[in-house]
Amino acid sequence: MILSFTSCKQITRQVQSPVTIGTIEYQGYGATLDAQSVMSMINLAAAYESMTLSDTVYTKVEGKIKEVCSKKGCWMTLDMGSGNDIMVRFKDYSFFMPLDAEGAVIVSGKAFVSETSVDDLKHYAEDAGATQAAIEAIVSPKKTYTFEAVGVLLAI
């Protein structure tokens, strides 16, 4: 059964049994994934640079978690290594990540460029534990590299 939420008020974790790929053990969340045909972060970063707001790329990419929503695990950011991050949300809020998730992940879904509203930026800053002054300093929307994941493999 899949539950769908429109905010990070409820927690649903679709967790699979751990799997070993090569020498790395992964815990799966959301849709079941394999580690075949995984795009490098360098190639995804290059793809993002050429994308417009209407473009979408369906892919799997390996990356490193930079931050996870500290309230519910309803989003995470991945480090692109170029000073930019990827905002990862989970399709239909059907699963969330552990609050203490860190390290390597493989995410599967769609990559696209979006514009994040001031309200959403403030919400994410609040979830990340930003100060009130930092939240109030957010006054304009931001071009965001976004990924809507249907499944995640978290290295454990």
Describe the function of each predicted region.
Residues 3-7:
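C-terminal motif of bacterial Sec signal peptides marking the signal peptidase cleavage site
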